[in-house]
């Protein structure tokens, strides 16, 4: 029997990243959700015409929704439909996952944010995270740590 290796998220699998989410929030838990998309949206995702910067996840009436995600239609999109780039898209999660997110998001200061959009076995998946907002001093400390790591890499590069 041959062991099947699991593929990691590689740069070619990732469609879009929400880099601002990791800067603005402490991500405590992540999970993966499917997306209910239309045909023109999938074509636009393949072309990489998506923006997650202003997007957020809202849980309403036992369903999870992605709001504020912009998927720009291709100019060659069908003429008989009017594509809406910022429409609300349904996230496909199990009821237990939605219940866990609802309970966690109701706590003070917690929210659910989209982290990245990627392909998995030919299907578009959204990584979402249960997050708590960072204070200004936390952001400064993270920035300072990143600068130090970058500077350390430069020093090591020049020593060799």
UniProtKB/Swiss-Prot annotation:
| Gene Ontology terms describing biological process | trans-translation
Annotated Gene Ontology cellular components are: cytosol
Has the keyword Methyltransferase been applied to this entry? no
| A GO MF term | RNA binding
Keywords, comma-separated and alphabetical: Cytoplasm, RNA-binding
Taxonomically, which superkingdom?
A: Bacteria
> Has the keyword Aminoacyl-tRNA synthetase been applied to this entry?
no
**Ranges of Basic and acidic residues composition bias in the record:** 139-150
Which Pfam families does this chain map to?
Answer: SmpB (PF01668)
Question: Do you know which CDD domains this protein is assigned to?
Answer: SmpB (cd09294)
| Family (UniProt) | Belongs to the SmpB family.
Which purpose does this protein serve, as stated in its record?
Required for rescue of stalled ribosomes mediated by trans-translation. Binds to transfer-messenger RNA (tmRNA), required for stable association of tmRNA with ribosomes. tmRNA and SmpB together mimic tRNA shape, replacing the anticodon stem-loop with SmpB. tmRNA is encoded by the ssrA gene; the 2 termini fold to resemble tRNA(Ala) and it encodes a 'tag peptide', a short internal open reading frame. During trans-translation Ala-aminoacylated tmRNA acts like a tRNA, entering the A-site of stalled ribosomes, displacing the stalled mRNA.
Record protein name field = SsrA-binding protein
Q: Look up and give the organism this protein is from.
A: Alkalilimnicola ehrlichii (strain ATCC BAA-1101 / DSM 17681 / MLHE-1)
């Amino acid at each position: 029997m041959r062991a099947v290796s699991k593929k990691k998220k590689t740069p070619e699998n990732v469609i879009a990243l929400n880099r601002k989410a990791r800067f603005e929030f402490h991500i405590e838990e992540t999970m993966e959700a499917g997306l209910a998309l239309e045909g023109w949206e999938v074509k636009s995702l393949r072309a990489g015409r998506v923006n997650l910067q202003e997007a957020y996840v809202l849980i309403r009436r036992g369903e999870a929704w992605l709001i504020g995600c912009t998927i720009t239609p291709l100019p060659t999109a069908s003429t008989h439909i009017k594509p809406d780039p910022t429409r609300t898209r349904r996230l496909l999660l199990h009821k237990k996952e939605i219940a866990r997110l609802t309970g966690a998001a109701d706590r003070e200061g917690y929210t659910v944010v989209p982290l990245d959009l990627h392909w998995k076995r030919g299907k578009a998946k959204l990584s979402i995270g249960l997050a708590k907002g960072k204070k200004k001093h936390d952001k400064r400390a993270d920035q300072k740590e990143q600068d130090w790591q970058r500077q350390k890499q430069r020093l090591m590069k020049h020593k060799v």
